[in-house]
Design a protein with these regions (language model features):
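Beta-sheet-dominated scaffold domains
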Residues: 37, 77-195
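Disordered, low-complexity "stalk" and linker segments at domain junctions of extracellular
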Residues: 1-37, 43-45, 68
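Short Trp-Ser/Thr-centered turn/loop motifs at beta-strand boundaries
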Residues: 1, 52-54, 155, 163
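Intrinsic-disorder/low-complexity coil detector
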Residues: 19, 24, 63, 69, ...
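Carboxylate/His-rich catalytic cores and anion/metal-binding grooves
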Residues: 29-63, 77
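Beta-strand initiation motifs
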Residues: 11-16, 60-67, 107-113, 152-154
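Hydrophobic side chains in beta-strands
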Residues: 7, 41-42, 53, 101, ...
Length: 195
């Protein structure tokens, strides 16, 4: 499902309609704020593989220059960006076919990007959760764990039941949440019997 997410200036104290920030890319698939306090616009400008970021803590500066750290990159992937999750000194970027990391390295390139997993794409923009063990996420036919370096398939006793019961025409509605006090991650999904 295509989304249209814009970077907006919103205050909880004002009863005003959120408006797009000047110079920020429009028609994004999603947003994430990195540990280094940059806003990543995912699928920026309607390009499903592009990530743009503003200058550090300056949501109005999106044009790269030698005097700032704004930038952009088109991921080398056949997939489309689905979600990004801040984790352990890096940002995990999940497409529908693979996984990448963005690590801050400073000027002139600002971020370094690396593919850390193949055949591990996610099916939803809300299916990943960062925990103290890493990022857990759901894919087309498996659950995965990004441990900070690589993506691993998770063995699961209820794998066949869950993946046999998911309504695949509604899988973009799957979402996850962590329950840290029990060391658990839960996924909520539309079942095969749902409309």
């Amino acid at each position: 499902a295509e989304q249209n997410v814009n970077v907006t200036d919103t205050s909880l104290k004002l009863a005003a309609i959120a408006t797009p920030i000047t110079n920020a890319p429009l028609s994004n698939l999603g947003l994430v704020v990195t540990e280094e306090r940059f806003i990543f616009a995912l699928g920026s400008g309607g390009n499903s593989r592009k990530i743009s970021w503003c200058d550090r803590e300056d949501r109005n500066q999106w044009t790269p220059a030698s005097t700032n750290e704004a930038g952009d990159i088109e991921l080398q992937t056949a997939g489309q960006i689905m979600q990004a999750v801040r984790t352990r000194g890096q940002t995990l970027i999940l497409t529908d076919v693979d996984a990448h990391t963005a690590r801050y390295q400073g000027p002139p390139y600002v971020y370094g990007f690396e593919r850390v997993g193949t055949s591990c794409g996610t099916v939803t923009s809300r299916g990943a959760v960062d925990t103290d063990r890493g990022v857990f996420f759901i894919g087309q036919e498996n659950f995965f764990l990004f441990n900070g370096n690589t993506v691993q398939t998770i063995k699961c006793d209820v794998h066949d039941y869950i993946f046999g019961d998911i309504n695949t025409s509604q899988q973009t509605k799957i979402w996850a949440m962590g329950i840290p006090q029990y060391g658990e991650v839960w996924w909520f999904y539309p079942s095969a019997n749902s409309i």
